[in-house]
Amino acid sequence: MTDVSSPAGGAASPVEMATSSSSAATTLTNGANKTAISTAAGVAPGAVPGPGSAAIPASSSSGNQVKLEHHHRQSNNNRPAATNRSSETKLRSPAGESDGASRLMTPAGSSSTPSQSPSPSQSPSQASIQTQTSQQDRLAKASTTASQQDVDEVARLFEEKPEAFEKWLTERAPPEALSRLQEFIENRKPHKRPSVTSDLFQQWMAASPTVQQKSPRSLSNSSASSIPECRRHLMDLDEGELFMELIRDVANELDIDVLCHKILVNVGLLTHADRGSLFLAKGTPTNKYLVAKLFDVTQKTALKDAVTRASAEEIIIPFGIGIAGMVAQTKQMINIKEAYKDARFNCEIDLKTGYKTNAILCMPICNYEGDIIGVAQIINKTNGGCFKGCMEFDEHDVEIFRRYLTFCGIGIQNAQLFEMSVQEYRRNQILLNLARSIFEEQNNLECLVTKIMTEARELLKCERCSVFLVDLDCCEASHLEKIIEKPNQPATRAIKSADSFEEKKMRNRFTVLFELGGEYQAANVSRPSVSELSSSTLAQIAQFVATTGQTVNICDVIEWVRDHNQIRAEDEIDSTQAILCMPIMNAQKKVIGVAQLINKANGVPFTDSDASIFEAFAIFCGLGIHNTQMYENACKLMAKQKVALECLSYHATASQDQTEKLTQDVIAEAESYNLYSFTFTDFELVDDDTCRAVLRMFMQCNLVSQFQIPYDVLCRWVLSVRKNYRPVKYHNWRHALNVAQTMFAMLKTGKMERFMTDLEILGLLVACLCHDLDHRGTNNAFQTKTESPLAILYTTSTMEHHHFDQCVMILNSEGNNIFQALSPEDYRSVMKTVESAILSTDLAMYFKKRNAFLELVENGEFDWQGEEKKDLLCGMMMTACDVSAIAKPWEVQHKVAKLVADEFFDQGDLEKLQLNTQPVAMMDRERKDELPKMQVGFIDVICLPLYRVLCDTFPWITPLYEGTLENRRNWQDLAEKVEMGLTWIDHDTIDKPVEEFAACADEEIKDIEFTVTTLNCNQQSQHGSEDSHTPEHQRSGSRLSMKKTGALGKAVRSKLSKTLYNSMDGSKPKTSLKLLESHVSEDMDDKSPTSPSQPQASGSMGRMSASSSTSSAGGQMVDKSKKRSKLCALL
């Protein structure tokens, strides 16, 4: 075997020779690389390589050959094909071979080697290299011999007939061509950049603990027969070479145990020390101590023995105690010639082992920041293997020791970081498993807690684990019961800290205890009593943690119990050395339990690292417990909801007597109810007539027979729907009836049924009747502001979703399913129509859909049969029906508007009372005079644009548009009168919008004399005057209606005359008044000084006289003074 020289030029070290075959072939020199390239190019084995290259023997390991193959493949990908035609290998197919197999042919004069089978002198690895080389050469040959014309021809054939090419590949392609194609595809794939750190970490995690403890370059891991030989080779090296070789030995070691063993063995070789010990720094910044990682290690001590002995007898040395402790505290080296003469030396170990310590050299190990991470100590210098008690460590030994420990400090810190990363990796894997368990075991709290405790015990290596759960009263007691159980205390009462602690202690009562013992013991679940908890020391510690919310790490249980005045249970304290106890909290930072670890396996206290890991377990435990409890509570609430729905369904369903009565009633024709007219009104219908009218609509649409709806089921459903409407002022059952009638009129009179299927007509009528079920008299914004359960349940279109859910609830009630005869597909279709139609009554949805609908109309749409088009059309029809009261005759419209206003005003009162906010104008009772103006705005923004586009597209529904226009004129007229101060809104209904004179039948109406003072409108208000601060709508109506000349305007005179002379029913005037205007003088001096608080105005006084004729009989008695006051108020 050819030797590879060491970097220093000397013989190979035994450390290098003791490595495995995989680690022996590390990096190739330039010569080796050149050899690999020449071999890949076809140079036969045994050929003379280029200068500076190392020969590759025929007996090389397969690992090296694989590496060379890989290197050749990568270099071939990045190197252009050779252009030397004379030395090319040619790819030929021999005649008579049907499989198309090729063979390598070399030019004359070159040595040829058969490629079919390797020669007996060739190894399989060499044959594989040659086979790989042949394939690469064939690919290079193919790429150089093919002309561009051939490539274009093949490409054109492939593009024109790809199916034929695929068929040729699958049926007739030679195997070699397929393998070459596959190889070409593999070579074209991008290579992933190798990550040494990631590969090393994955190899480390995948290896067994036995493999992980082995050092690939460790002298101590060599066989017993090779140790003297290795030591002899190391002794042959000079000091510099030996130093560098031992540094390389520890440079890449990541296992902390193996690294420490290497350091002590190598230091013994460098300083001729008999044995050594290595201590690592642990603890917090305020309480640091040394832990003996390996103790009394000689050059012959095996790694396993050293680790076992250190684990069995863990030695802890505080900083500042003993020789090693002083070195760690002062960071100064200590060199002692005679140990027994030094007061810091502890001879107990010598007495115990029988070994005598003479010379000691102790030196600190620091990291790059200068912090102490360990202390190395060597004992008793030897001379060539012979121990002489008088020998001491000289300055040269100290310098060698210091230099070597500098490199060792880097290695130790790297190994510690790697150990931390491995620990974090394992912890993350466990936490991922815990997260998986939370989802898998969310319905079983016992299994979940048991899994968490098992993982915590195995990771933290403790003897026992316990979890205490606090009684939270989750969803068990009602609010009233909680108030009675815990009455409110006065806010000013002074509470002592002890009282507060006791109150918290009583509040955090443990109800469930989970205990997990040894490895093969099952978890124990119990419900301890109050007496059992009070007599247990472990329970008292858990109670303290639950009350304070603090983590407790107890090293001495007896001392802690004495300091905190807790009950001391002898049987528990005797078996307990260390306790780590931590609160378990939910998302609201409320303690829901306590997790407790008892006794680490090696008898040492729990460290801060243990507490950090255990904190993650506590968080996941809290998440799992909270999730499980929420799941259990959700199941209970769902069960309660089912019971409540059953009760609600029973009480929401119409009684059997009512159903039978309606079933037997005679249903009048549609004309008698005026169902075909857009001017339908329900004022004259009693409640039973409203139900009969609904039944008639279903009959006229032929829905009962078409969908085989049982008549008694339909009657019960109509009565149940009526029963589930609340008695609010507007959004009640009668509003639903009017909406359904308008839909019926649009379908029949408006001829919209020609665009709908029978199933869609059924869905639209059901949606109209159910679109405001269980309306509370408040809108969606109010539900959101008050954070009502409905707003939490439905984030958008709150009330509309609730209406649909109520509709579904009634349909699912026994004896109310009018869709029971439908097929599953028809049932899904009609329910989709009902849902979409009900949600479309939300004006927010109307504004979203309006633009798309207008776009369809502008594009001349006439079919309306697509799914999206039909949905838009149905949505616009639902909105048109929902606001159809605006198109009713005026005597109906203004009464309905007053009902709507009263319902809005009630909501405004609730906002003032509950939310302490100022409602908007339409809901503010104090601004009721603005109702006509707001009605005009509502018509202009929503109603008229909708009815106009529907009327243009479907001309048969023009009455809706015309009625809306007429009502807009009436509301505009009323708004102008209110603005001029000629009327006010203070009646129960707006049936008498203007106060009028009523003539008496038996009293002669005499002239009424009154004066009207007109102010000079040309006079500008002085700055700071009272009039300048008066709102415009609160100023005198006469002033607002005057012209600059002081006379009443023409529009005002016509409106005043109409109001005074015409009655509400449009009959002839009952009274005749003559209104005389006075001439207004404008001789006021604009520059005359006036008082800011008393503005001066001038004008002439005019007399107005009114003569009346005899009034008709039936008028009211009105005295003279009352008439005068009313007329003055009007003006």
Swiss-Prot record:
Biased composition (Low complexity): 42-63, 110-136, 1097-1117
Compositional bias per record (Basic residues), positions renumbered to this chain: 1121-1131
Major location (coarse): membrane
Cofactor note: Binds 2 divalent metal cations per subunit. Site 1 may preferentially bind zinc ions, while site 2 has a preference for magnesium and/or manganese ions.
Domain PDEase, chain residue ranges per copy: 655-978
Active site, renumbered: 731 (proton donor)
Residues excised as propeptide: 1129-1131
Keyword Membrane listed: yes
GO molecular function ontology, one term from the record: metal ion binding
Pfam families per the UniProt record, alphabetical: GAF (PF01590), PDEase_I (PF00233)
Ranges annotated as biased composition (Polar residues): 75-86
Occurrences of domain GAF (ranges): 255-412, 444-625
Coiled coil: none
Reaction catalysis annotation: 3',5'-cyclic GMP + H2O = GMP + H(+)
Function comment: Has a role regulating cGMP transport in Malpighian tubule principal cells.
Family label: Belongs to the cyclic nucleotide phosphodiesterase family.
Subunit structure: Interacts with PrBP.
UniProt-recorded name of the protein: cGMP-specific 3',5'-cyclic phosphodiesterase
